[in-house]
């Protein structure tokens, strides 16, 4: 039996609550907990000066602050600790807090536990945001009051009292959010799995185990959607407790969704023609097939077809920016892993000038080099990983006897100017970094917006 939110309200009232991280998602959470009668202390590495008006507002509401480099030193003595998603549960400060009797949780765990509406959870290495947005749009088109959150949209926990049982909730869930998840998710989707975030996870096994939590606590009547074309996700079928639907662009699946020549098919019925889809690339065909499966019990073929033939994509995902002197510029800043960049490269009909490099997530670049050689006419590298990427391409070029020019640039701006200088009419330039942005930018959106700003001023 699903818990009611009144139970949480009774539980949290007058509790001593620590919230770790004063970021975009936690600010509404902190305000909400105060409104519910909790005594909140907010923890953050930033200084009071760096927090600015947020710190002033918090103090005016009686919210205590623990700030600075050693902000986690005083995490003991709390009844409840809300951790940030990327904070490992074996963090020494959390271990101490738990030993002192604290209940360790996160906003997403509590939201899923008490959410009255049907939840559609989406995870995977690539395609999460596009698929989440597709599912959201299909359910909206069908006429449901639909909420979207997790990695995209707004934090939802503070809106939970506005939600009704007949509403739908669509969540994009990262491996970090899922690491400690022990809640039932009614309709779960794993788009695909490949090495990612190995800077945070101990190894690939831990990363996959985190992703499995999206379906680990399902019941027999729930739904799990898996990618048959991906070896890892296909192997998860045998671990499912719920009903399973699969999707494929390589083989027919009568009880799922598949690409049949030039038609997208769900449960034997044509949804739309391949030529009518607005999204570029076969990876987006997979995203559509996955979305169709996930909403198959809640939306009509007509709603699916309408979205499939009108949806043009999400910002920073193979996003066309402009054409200058016959050269087309694309922003694929979301591509923070080699597999994501490979998918982006496959979307183009010809080899491109690729701008890549960034923060090191300790993911191998050899797969990108091996496939990328046929899809890249020139490579412009920048960021912390530029030498690692160059080494992978140098080896692949030597092994195959192929040579593509590689340019090494110190700055992000310089990389874009270099790409412009080497491009000729008819060429395509794409920013598809294969890395996270944290060496130069707070997130991929800021990186993508900077790229667009520079390109629009060329």
UniProtKB/Swiss-Prot annotation:
Keywords: ATP-binding, Cell cycle, Cell division, Cell shape, Cell wall biogenesis/degradation, Cytoplasm, Ligase, Nucleotide-binding, Peptidoglycan synthesis. Pathway: Cell wall biogenesis; peptidoglycan biosynthesis. It comes from the Bacteria. It catalyses: UDP-N-acetyl-alpha-D-muramoyl-L-alanine + D-glutamate + ATP = UDP-N-acetyl-alpha-D-muramoyl-L-alanyl-D-glutamate + ADP + phosphate + H(+). InterPro entries: Mur-like_cat_sf, Mur_ligase_C, Mur_ligase_C_dom_sf, Mur_ligase_cen, MurD. The keyword Lyase does not apply. GO terms for biological process: cell division; cell wall organization; peptidoglycan biosynthetic process; regulation of cell shape. Its EC number is 6.3.2.9. Coiled coil: none annotated. GO terms for molecular function: ATP binding; UDP-N-acetylmuramoylalanine-D-glutamate ligase activity. ATP binds at residues 124-130. It is found in: Cytoplasm. GO terms for cellular component: cytoplasm. HAMAP family: MurD. Belongs to the MurCDEF family. NCBIfam families: murD (TIGR01087). Cell wall formation. Catalyzes the addition of glutamate to the nucleotide precursor UDP-N-acetylmuramoyl-L-alanine (UMA). This is UDP-N-acetylmuramoylalanine--D-glutamate ligase.
């Amino acid at each position: 039996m699903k818990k009611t939110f009144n139970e949480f309200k009774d539980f949290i009232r007058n509790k001593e609550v620590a919230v770790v991280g004063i970021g975009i998602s936690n600010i509404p959470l902190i305000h909400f907990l105060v409104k519910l009668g909790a005594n909140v202390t907010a923890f953050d590495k930033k200084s009071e000066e760096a927090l600015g008006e947020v710190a002033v507002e918090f103090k005016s509401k009686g919210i205590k602050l623990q700030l600075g480099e050693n902000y986690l030193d005083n995490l003991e003595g709390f009844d409840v600790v809300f951790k940030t998603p990327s904070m490992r549960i074996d963090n020494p400060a959390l271990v101490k807090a738990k030993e002192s009797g604290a209940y360790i949780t996160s906003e997403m765990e509590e939201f899923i536990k008490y959410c009255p509406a049907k939840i559609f959870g989406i995870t995977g290495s690539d395609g999460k945001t596009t698929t989440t947005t597709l599912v959201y749009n299909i359910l909206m088109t069908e006429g449901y009051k639909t909420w979207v959150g997790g990695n995209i949209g707004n934090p939802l926990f503070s809106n939970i009292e506005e939600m009704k049982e007949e509403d739908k909730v669509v969540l994009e869930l990262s491996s970090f959010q899922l690491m400690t998840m022990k809640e039932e998710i009614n309709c779960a989707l794993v788009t695909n799995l490949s090495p990612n975030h190995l800077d945070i996870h101990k190894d690939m096994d831990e990363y996959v185990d985190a992703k499995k939590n999206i379906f680990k606590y399902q019941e027999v009547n729930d739904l799990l959607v898996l990618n048959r074309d991906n070896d890892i996700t296909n192997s998860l079928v045998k671990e499912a407790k719920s009903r399973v639907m699969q999707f494929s662009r390589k083989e027919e699946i009568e009880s799922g969704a598949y690409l049949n020549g030039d038609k997208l098919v769900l449960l034997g019925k044509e949804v739309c023609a391949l030529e009518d889809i607005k999204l570029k690339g076969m990876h987006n065909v997979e995203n559509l097939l996955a979305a169709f499966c996930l909403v198959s019990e809640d939306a009509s073929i007509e709603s699916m077809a309408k979205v499939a033939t009108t949806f043009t994509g999400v910002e920073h995902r193979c996003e066309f920016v402009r054409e200058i002197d016959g050269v087309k510029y694309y922003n694929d800043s979301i591509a923070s892993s080699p597999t994501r960049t490979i998918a982006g490269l496959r979307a183009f009909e010809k080899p491109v000038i690729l701008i890549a490099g960034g923060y090191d997530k300790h993911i191998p670049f050899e797969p990108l080099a091996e496939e990328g050689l046929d899809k890249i006419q020139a490579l412009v590298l920048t960021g912390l990983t530029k030498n690692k990427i160059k080494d992978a391409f140098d080896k692949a070029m030597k092994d195959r006897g192929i040579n593509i020019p590689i340019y090494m640039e110190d700055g992000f701006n310089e990389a874009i100017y270099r790409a412009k200088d080497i491009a000729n009419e008819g060429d395509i330039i794409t920013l598809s970094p294969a890395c996270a942005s944290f060496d130069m930018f707070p997130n991929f959106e800021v990186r993508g917006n900077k790229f667009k700003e520079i390109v629009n001023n060329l």
